[in-house]
Amino acid sequence: MDDPKIMNIMNGMKSLEDHCQLISDVKDESPMQMFYKDKGVFLTGGTGFFGKIIIEKLLRVTEVGQIYLLIRTKKGKDAFARIEDLFNDPVFAKMKQVNPKYRCQITIISGDCSLPGLGISADERETIMENVNIVLHSAATVRFDEKLKMAIAINVHGTKEIIKLAKEIVNLKALVHVSTAFAHCNMRHIQERFYSGTMSGENAFKLSECLDEHTLNTLTPTIIKGYPNTYTFTKVLAENVVQQSAQNLPVTIFRPGIVITTYREPVTGWIDNMYGPCGVIVGIGSGVLRVFTGDMDNKAHIVPVDMCVNALLASAWDIARNKYETPPIYNYVPDAENMVTWRRYMEDGFEYGCDIPMRKSIWYPRFTIVPHMWQYHILCFLYHTLPALVMDAIMVIIGKKPRMMKIYRKIHKLSNVLKYFSSNEFRFDNDNVRKLTEKLDDRDKRLFAFDMRDLDWTNLFRVSLYGLRLYVVKDDPSNIPESIKRYERLKVLHYTTLAVFYALAAWALYALLKLFL
């Protein structure tokens, strides 16, 4: 791989991963390490993207006593089977080298945030009450189109059950509720404070209990009016539950922006999903997504997951040390001193994606961004629907299963989800996050770095593209030279096809003019 563009990416990754060496060079225990040492941490959402990094960080950098993981049965796999899958993820490789006996620090709690009492047995509940010191509640249904009844059960009632459990814990030091920076997206300026919603969390739960699912689905647009989806609506309700029910607890609310790949640790560019803007980049890189809508000059409030987790862990440390009149709220978003636009994200993603193209791309990557929906629908038909129908027809003729229209339905669904956030401009206050940064000593600033003012966006976008290719698309780095050759062939095919199309269009126009003139 002697290509200078590829070497730039690899060198950028090397410089970022050197940060992990700096972490290992910290010899004396830092204040945050001492805080987590021998503590019992109860974590919800541990099998998710965000939760994996929380677990990895605690096991690799701190001497945490025990992590109690609330895990539900899913797709026929119980909690114990799912934990095996969890630790097979490559994101834990470095942690396993540093802490080979990590399994001794993991206790599985079978349960479900949507169930009464979290579905936890009496014995396990007693274990939590006696041994847990820190509660990190990150579990949520993040599906924007989730049915309202289920979204309320998990995001709202689940939060109420967590608070109820936290009140029973004998030696609780900190409770962190993970919300989202876009919970209050019905407003354009979002401060680090509580806001009142259209109804209380308690009333929303009562409403979902007394109405059947069909009726609730019918009424959903009216109930969530002012919010783009059930996810943001129920996140507002969950914050209301914290405000009303957890005032006497050492509690804080952590609101991350749009979370993307890791920046530096434990490995650069790691991700395990295609949600949000990362899915858009994969769609463009694979040659499938060719048109997108939004105001590309709006700010992109994206944050790397490793820095986000560091800030969350620091918020728990801070609430355990200080008493506040009202629960502190942290908007963890890019700092005003160091922000990028959606245009920068999309264009850089496209540029770096062309440097290391995907081996399984179905066409030469090209994309167009339009601000108006009428433009978007016209171009979607021309660039997405029409080619998909042709390709599916060919697949049927040769006896294979058509799949392009199914793919495009998913893509259009993703585009519809993101257009609200890319078309509207949001401004966030982050004074509490800045103050939290200043409370860290030099050791913790290295061990738990989360100052977004220090982020190098160019490096982040480069390693993100590499990570998406490696961890999501499953393209091995060794096939990059082969992929570049294929990319060049697709480029020739693309422009040849365009030339033929325009030639035929010109001929047809000439024939029509000749016929009528």
UniProtKB/Swiss-Prot annotation:
Location comes to: Apical cell membrane
Q: What class of enzyme is it?
A: oxidoreductase
Which keywords annotate this record? Cell membrane, Lipid biosynthesis, Lipid metabolism, Membrane, NADP, Oxidoreductase, Transmembrane, Transmembrane helix
* E.C. number: 1.2.1.84
Catalytic activity reads: a long-chain fatty acyl-CoA + 2 NADPH + 2 H(+) = a long-chain primary fatty alcohol + 2 NADP(+) + CoA
Q: Does the keyword NADP apply?
A: yes
Pfam family example for this protein? Sterile
* Keyword Zinc recorded: no
- The main place the protein resides is membrane
Q: Name one GO molecular function term.
A: alcohol-forming long-chain fatty acyl-CoA reductase activity
* Protein family according to the UniProt entry: Belongs to the fatty acyl-CoA reductase family.
Q: What does this protein do?
A: Catalyzes the reduction of saturated fatty acyl-CoA to fatty alcohols. The preferred substrates are C24:0 and C26:0. Necessary for the final stages of tracheal maturation, to facilitate the transition from water-filled to gas-filled tubes. May help to maintain the integrity of the outer hydrophobic envelope of the trachea.
Name assigned to this protein: Fatty acyl-CoA reductase wat
Species lineage, top-down? Eukaryota, Metazoa, Ecdysozoa, Arthropoda, Hexapoda
The gene that this protein is the product of is wat
